[in-house]
Design a protein with these regions (language model features):
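Active-site loop/lid in soluble adenylation, ligation, and acyl-transfer enzymes
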Residues: 2, 110, 345, 349-351
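Extracytoplasmic gating/loop element in the C-terminal half of outer-membrane beta-barrel translocons
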Residues: 88, 374-464, 469
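Glycine-rich, aromatic-lined ligand/substrate-binding cores of catalytic
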Residues: 347-380
């Protein structure tokens, strides 16, 4: 429901009230039978033995009541306030409802009388906002213990405990502060926005490894979702557009935007001061995007074994001292389980990222392109790592495997192929950290608008020929499949975005 009203020619009020409700359900069924009786008949009845049957069901609900009030005084002073109450079935009954709000202020300075003598300023608006938002991005039943059914013997049904519940789990909350400046200068030949943001997140939901008495494992694979941390994100963002040429026949606009931000974990519980999940470690004072892993030293030229710098326990059977370039000695090991892990001074966060767009028109021709970029940051290229390990069962190698160690005396950074040592030679380490810097030609387009004289002859209001290309090329050092990673610092087994070329004509009558 929406209400807007203008009072006394200078007061403008807009009020919004709303309600939303979502019901999410997913289900699936699967089956496998073997022993085909007749060829080319794929119905279950044509197979003699049931190998497996399975099914799944999951559901969650969310509901929200929200409101928003916008007010401005003659377009000069602006106020915006919002409030919402949200509930989500992912949390315990007494913790699933929470209140969230925000307030924003704006001041259009160019409308003040003291700016009347500054004709080259078309827009100059200061704005700021602050509030509380919530995040429910977790599984559907994290607060409840989970059981896996179907563990039957010959005569009795059986179940096993699959996960422990987290009865105190609740919303993550974030308190965002935004301060910005919108400007337009020289008859809007130069315009854009500058901004600073600060996000204080609390009640972060982490998967916490459980102690052995809770069913935990030495590897830490048994976890429970808990609200245990606080984190700060802060940074700067800018978008600036310029119009170098503005005329009757020729127009040219250039837009550049850039964002830079930092991240720091500011609080962890005393009982769990650090969480290690290779290749990261979560602890106070560090970024959750900072890599924590083994230091890959190279390859032993005599044996072809992978070497890792720093050992937990020195052993002559798997450790050795190697003289370094500075005349000192480095302690290395061939046993990845005995290799020390530490921060490697690399993060998945870029120094800066953004895009560059260009639009040029001359008479009836239009040309444009968009380039996105990221400068700095690293990614753990797990896809590349999988392509550099032993390719059993029909697996695939990366062409870099041709540079592997093959005989004593070979100098290379790729260890020998050895089925019995693949876990050691391909262990998680900074060997697979790759620069995430990239430049991408996202879009290029060319169009021609038919002149009015021709349009009148065919009784058309407009006609336009066009050709465009998307995802033309990625410039990157990445070696895995999909070269466009993300700030999580991990990769996935997915192909590059498809290169698409479109051409056509658009006519309106």
């Amino acid at each position: 429901m929406n209400f807007n009203k203008r009072f006394a020619s200078v007061h403008n009020v807009d009020v919004l009230l709303g309600h939303e409700n979502y019901d999410y359900k997913t289900s699936g069924i699967s089956g496998l039978r073997i022993g085909q009786a007749f060829e080319n008949i794929y119905q279950f009845s044509n197979f003699g033995t049931i190998n497996s049957l399975g099914s799944s069901f999951s559901a969650s609900r969310s509901e929200g009541f929200f409101s928003r009030v916008n007010y401005d005084y003659n377009g000069k002073y602006l106020l915006s306030a919002s409030f919402r109450r949200d509930g989500n079935s992912k949390f315990p009954t007494d913790l699933r409802w929470a209140n969230f709000w925000s307030i924003g202020l704006g001041w259009s300075l160019e409308k003040e009388s003291f700016f009347a003598s500054v004709p080259w300023v078309d827009q100059l608006k200061l704005r700021a906002s602050y509030g509380v938002t919530g995040n429910s991005n977790t599984g559907n039943y994290p607060y409840q213990a989970g059981y896996d059914i179907g563990w039957d013997d010959d005569t009795r049904p059986g179940i096993i405990l699959q996960s422990l519940g987290s009865p105190q789990l609740t919303w993550e909350t974030q308190k965002p502060l935004d301060i910005g400046l919108d400007f337009g200068l020289f008859k809007n030949r130069l315009y854009g926005t500058l901004g600073y943001f600060y996000r204080n997140s609390s009640g972060l939901i982490f998967s916490v490894p459980q102690p052995l008495q809770n069913g935990g494992t030495p590897s830490g694979s048994f976890t429970v979702s808990q609200n245990i941390g606080e984190m700060v994100n802060k940074g700067l963002e800018a978008q600036i557009s310029a119009v170098p040429v503005r005329g009757k026949n020729l127009n040219w606009t250039v837009t550049v935007n850039a964002t830079r931000y930092t991240n720091e974990l500011t609080k962890m519980p005393e009982a769990t001061p650090a969480l290690t999940s290779s290749p990261f470690k979560r602890e106070v004072g560090k970024s959750i995007y900072e890599f924590y892993t083994r230091d890959y030293y190279g390859v032993d030229p005599q044996t072809g074994s992978a070497l890792y710098k720093g050992v937990l326990n020195y052993s002559p059977t798997n450790s050795q001292l190697i003289k370094n370039k500075n005349g000192g000695f480095d302690t290395v090991t061939i046993d990845h389980n005995n290799a020390r892990q530490d921060y490697v001074n690399k993060t998945s966060l870029p120094d800066v990222y953004g895009s560059f767009a260009n639009s040029l028109s001359y008479k009836n021709f239009e040309l444009g392109f968009v380039i996105t970029y990221q400068i700095g940051g690293y990614v753990y290229d797990g896809v590349y790592a999988s392509l550099m390990s032993t390719a059993t069962n029909g697996g695939t190698y990366h062409t870099d495997i041709l540079r592997r160690w093959q005989k004593p005396g070979d100098i290379t950074d790729i260890p020998r192929l050895d089925n019995t040592r693949s876990s050691q030679f391909g262990a998680t380490s900074d060997r697979f950290l790759t620069s995430a810097t990239y430049f991408s030609i996202n879009n290029v387009s060319l169009a021609y608008r038919l002149p009015k004289a021709f349009l009148s002859a065919i009784n058309a209001t407009s006609a336009r020929f066009f050709i465009s290309a998307e995802n033309l090329h990625f410039f990157t050092k990445r070696n895995g499949m999909n070269v466009n990673g993300n700030f999580s610092g991990q990769t996935s087994d997915s192909y590059d975005a498809a290169r698409v070329i479109n051409a056509g004509i658009s006519v309106n009558f």
